[in-house]
Each structure stands twice: as C-alpha cells, then as structure tokens.
A protein has these predicted regions:
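Conserved "HGTGT" condensation-loop signature of ketosynthase/thiolase-family condensing enzymes
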Residues: 1-131
Length: 131
C-alpha cells in the first residue's frame, strides 16, 4: 500500500503484480491475503504472477531479475505466466495468470520481494509517457 501511495499511483491504477510467489502454502496464502487486504475487490481484476515459477528462486538475485521482468512487462504490455499452475489452492483465489502469458495494457505494476528476517520491499513501476 505504501509503495502505491508513495509512487503517486492509485490502487485502481495497478494492472499487474509480480508476487514473491515461492509456491509455499503459508507464504503464498499470506501474500494473497495481503493483496486482498490492500486492494479489496480490485485485487480480482489485477493480473498476478510468480516469476520464480520460470526461474526458480534466485536467492539474492531474485528481486533484481523480477524487477527487470516487471519493467519489460510494462514496456511491452505482456504479463508472463505462472507456469506449472495445475492445482490452485482454494485460499489463493486471485488471477495468477496460469500457464499462458497475457497481452494487456500494463500502465502500472508492482514487484514484491520478501526475505527472511523481515527484509521486505515492493517496487512500483509506471509506464513512461511523453508529457
């Protein structure tokens, strides 16, 4: 919520969220609940994915690689899929962009990175437009 506020975006502007998404039930459920708490009903219209489904967990490099993926999504209006998404957890009921990339306008996006011990960050990306 703070990343959206500080970026000058509004919650309803967010088109895409790259989650930390490690495919661990406690982590994925907690992140899903956090997204729903911040965005309310808007959460159901946002494309969400886990880049880690394609790259694996890159540990210290994960946040940087995922941020590059988010920037490319904003530049190219395409959201990468969450691959190998076969058995949805009923508690994770958002649009996780399962198995197939989605082409849609991406004006604003967020990239979540969380670490052990409370090292947490969300980066906000806005599409560049000429003034």
């Amino acid at each position: 919520e703070l990343a959206v506020k500080k970026s000058g975006m509004r919650l309803e502007d967010v088109d895409y969220i790259n989650t930390h998404g490690t495919a661990t039930p406690p982590g994925d459920i907690a992140e899903t609940n956090a997204i729903k708490r911040v965005f309310g009903e808007l959460a159901y219209g946002i494309n969400i994915n886990s880049t880690k489904s394609m790259t694996g967990h890159l540990l210290g490099a994960a946040g940087s690689v995922e941020f590059v993926a988010v920037v490319l999504s904003v530049m190219n209006d395409i959201i990468p899929p969450t691959i190998n998404y076969e058995k949805p957890d009923p508690e994770c009921d958002l649009n996780y962009t399962p198995n197939t990339a989605v082409r849609r306008e991406v004006r604003f996006a967020l990239s979540n990175s969380f670490g052990f011990g409370g090292h947490n960050a969300t980066l906000a990306v806005r599409k560049f437009t000429e003034m």
